[in-house]
Swiss-Prot record:
Zn(2+) binds at residues 420, 438, 469. GO terms for molecular function: exo-oligoalginate lyase activity; metal ion binding. It is found in: Periplasm. Changing residue 207 to L: Complete loss of activity against alginate and its three block structures. The active site is at residues 264, 418. Its main location: periplasm. Homodimer. The record marks 207-208 as: Neutralizes the sugar carboxylate group at subsite +1. Optimum pH is 8.5. The zinc ion likely plays a structural role. This is Alginate lyase. It comes from Stenotrophomonas maltophilia (strain K279a). Changing residue 264 to F: Complete loss of activity against alginate and its three block structures.
Length: 742
């Protein structure tokens, strides 16, 4: 017979007990003591509901069984609380991670099953920490300004506390007063005090500080320490300059976009939502989920929208294989669904194949059992950046559903220290794959052999550098000369964004990335009946105050099929492209002579062909390069890129079209549609506007007009081969059918 949770048994037994008069007079004091130790992060009533109903719902029952199996293996292996010695990925580091996971699981399973073995296991582990923690100073492998105690960086200490305090809250009323006092006075309280005492970590607007304030705030609620809660909410000085509330106000845009990008939005989401949940349960009058028009719940939706094929857009410092199945977003989906009842989130939960053993997780399980899931609608959107939404944004253009075409134009803020120097960078996805790529971060997370799992030196020398991205490089220097603090002061200006059924377009201007240089990028995702799939049109206009070298890389995924230009190759030697700012990591494989006529490059990826037609207003070289040079430790992936180079110009315009087409099936041995349906790309300059014309094999012409001044509503005209294109406003789609002279 399954045991009931202990608190359920006590609740049922109390009304039937025959107590002497003296005991009755002591009842209020006993009730007060019980209230002082009762769980507060998840209430006793909520635990009781999960214990009595959870196994009736397959998703919840499966998660509970998985957690039980995992924890029993840990319990069988015995308790191990080692003296901290290692970096990330090392034995002691990984053991302390397993320990906080075990503490959380033990507390949860005690409440769901009533089995005292889980209490004993968690208690004994925490008592060992009570012996260890007072002896610890800065970690011997300490990283950064503030080493941790249990871990090499203080961030991991915060993560430990966020998880462990939840497990402790669940067993606290099952412990003796002596054990509670030992554990709290020697583990949880000194841990929280250590975090609060380090303002360089605690009083910051950054994801590290989010974890710290969530840890101390949740600990404050459990220990009934309102002073600690107030410091967590308002900063260590309680002056509202820092703390959890200020972080909500400054780190998210009104749309729910997080400044550091999707990868770190994913990481920060867990402490934001877990602490917000604790605040809502203990101080509902704060209305934390309503703050800034519900921005925390918006952030969950935005994070899912910032993904393709289940993986997050890897902008800034990002690990490529992080996606919607991460544990942080599992928590986010559960909490957001419980607060909103948005059935679209249930389809994300189905993809995650997991849920939390929490009241929110139970609600998800109940809804899934009732078949309430609806498809999540991935749609085009402009996610404004900055606290007031006026510091650029992330433009997402989409057609043909979840695995169709997605174009991402990165017109965002710098992203603090995790930001890359890639203003107006872009990515493109199609057929379930990244096609125009972003390297992400140079890091092997928690792989000890790769420098302990930290960001590698190549993250700074390659991955952050501008040439590692698909945007303008001037004189082989990175944006803001590679200084992120300078980058924080300057953001792109979004010119316009529009998304219709057949035309989706985004445009932004960047100034001050280079002294005296301004550049504007306009990109469109265009559908046409004579094309099999939507195409990407790209227009990059550069204006400088002196002659310079302009490089425009395109990092792509696939195997080159044809190069539509003559080039010099280097079969006997492989020159390195440059000496610094990322160029030292590029091998030069082929180089064309300068020319102004549009050229092409075609490649094959996962059974689909891609033809890239490109040109420029001034003579340009086409260089084929590959990453991986000057990499003696083999830390970099070998990836191809095309680099257009214009020398000695003040102004230049780059224009291109990327066309997905055809099918290759090696198993069935057939090829369809290997030839591009676009015959020519033509760029024509007018007095105050440009027209890019795509001339199709069918005879039809796709034309896009773009005005220099996006604010104007006046008429613009550009003549192309005797045909006058006219439109009003910032831009217009101006197609012509075969034989159309109008």
């Amino acid at each position: 017979m399954r045991l009931q949770p202990l608190f359920v048994s006590l609740a049922l037994a109390a009304p039937c007990a025959l107590l002497p008069t003296a005991s009755l007079s002591a009842a209020p004091a006993a009730a007060a003591r019980q209230a002082d130790t009762a769980p507060v992060l998840v209430t006793a009533a909520q635990w009781q509901q999960m214990a009595s109903e959870g196994r009736r719902y397959p998703w919840f029952a499966k998660e509970q069984a998985r957690t039980e199996a995992t924890l029993k293996k840990m319990m069988k292996a015995g308790i191990d609380v080692p003296v901290p010695r290692d970096k990330g990925g090392g034995r002691t580091h990984e053991q302390h991670k397993r320990n906080y996971q075990a503490l959380l699981a033990a507390g949860t399973l005690y409440r769901l099953t009533g089995d005292r073995a889980y209490v004993d296991y968690a208690r004994d582990m925490l008592l060992q920490y009570a012996q260890l923690y007072p002896t610890l100073g800065p970690h011997p492998e300490g990283r950064g300004q503030i080493p941790g105690r249990v871990f090499w960086q203080v961030l991991n200490d915060s993560v430990w506390l966020v998880n462990a305090i939840q497990g402790y809250d669940a067993i606290r009323d099952a412990l003796s007063a002596e054990d509670r006092n030992t554990i709290e006075s020697k583990v949880f309280r000194p841990m929280a005090e250590f975090l609060v005492s380090e303002p360089k970590n605690y009083d910051q607007i950054h994801n590290h500080a989010t974890w710290a304030v969530a840890a101390t705030g949740m600990t404050g609620y459990v220990l009934r320490d309102q002073e600690l809660v107030e410091k967590s909410l308002r900063g260590s000085q309680k002056d509202d300059k820092f703390g959890f509330l200020r972080q909500i106000d400054l780190l998210f845009s009104p749309d729910g976009y997080y400044e550091e990008g999707p990868y770190y939005q994913r990481y920060a989401l867990a402490p934001f939502l877990l602490f917000a949940n604790a605040i809502e349960r203990n101080e509902p009058q704060r209305k934390i989920f309503a703050r800034r028009d519900g921005v925390l719940l918006k952030a969950v939706d935005v994070l899912v929208q910032s993904s393709y094929g289940g993986l997050f857009f890897p902008i800034n410092d990002a690990i490529l294989d992080k996606g919607i199945d991460t544990e942080e977003l599992v928590a986010g989906i559960g909490i957001a669904y419980a607060r909103t009842g948005d059935d679209r989130l249930l389809s994300v939960a189905e993809q995650q194949k997991r849920l939390l053993l929490s009241p929110e997780g139970l609600q998800v399980a109940q809804a899934l059992a009732a078949n309430k899931a609806k498809p999540f609608d991935y749609h085009p959107m402009l996610l404004r950046d900055g606290p007031d939404g006026d510091r650029g944004g992330l433009a997402i253009l989409r057609m043909n559903g979840e695995r169709g075409q997605a174009l991402v134009q990165k017109d965002t803020m710098q992203g603090m220290g995790h930001g890359h120097f890639d203003k107006l960078n872009w990515l493109f996805y199609d057929n379930g794959n990244p096609v125009v790529t972003d390297y992400g971060a140079a890091r092997f997370l928690n792989v000890e052999a790769k420098r302990g799992g930290i960001y590698l030196a190549e993250n700074r020398s390659w991955a952050k550098q501008t040439v590692a991205h698909n945007t303008l490089v001037v004189d082989e220097q990175s944006h803001f000369n590679g200084n992120w603090k300078r980058g924080e002061a300057h953001a792109p200006q979004v010119r316009f964004f529009q998304a219709d059924a057949d035309t989706q377009i985004a445009s932004a201007t960047m100034r001050d990335a280079y002294p005296g240089v301004a550049f504007t990028r306009t990109q469109a995702l265009l559908r046409h009946p004579d094309l099999g799939l939507p195409v990407v049109l790209d227009l990059l206009q550069v204006h400088g105050d002196k002659a310079a070298r302009y490089d425009l890389p395109l990092h792509f995924n696939g195997h080159i099929v044809t190069t539509g230009f003559e080039a010099e190759h280097f079969p006997s030697q492989r020159p390195v492209l440059g000496k610094d700012n990322g160029y030292q990591h590029l091998w030069l494989d082929a180089r064309s002579k300068p020319g102004s006529e549009p050229r092409s490059l075609a490649w094959l990826l996962d059974g689909r062909f891609y033809t890239y037609r490109f040109g420029s207003s001034a003579p340009a070289q086409a260089l084929l390069v590959e990453s991986g040079a000057n990499d003696p430790e083999f830390n970099l992936r070998r990836e191809p890129a095309l680099l257009q180079r214009v020398d000695g110009q003040k102004d230049v315009t780059f224009f291109s079209v990327l066309e997905p087409h055809g099918e290759y099936n090696g198993t069935a041995e057939y090829v369809h549609g290997a030839d591009s349906r676009i015959r020519e790309i033509v760029r024509t300059r007018g007095s105050d506007a440009e027209v890019i014309e795509l001339r199709l094999a069918s005879g039809a012409r796709i034309a896009l007009g773009v005005a220099d001044n996006s604010a104007t509503t006046s008429e613009h005209s550009v003549t192309v081969d005797g045909h006058v294109y006219r439109w009003n406003g910032s831009h217009a789609r101006l197609d012509r059918s075969k034989g159309d002279g109008k």
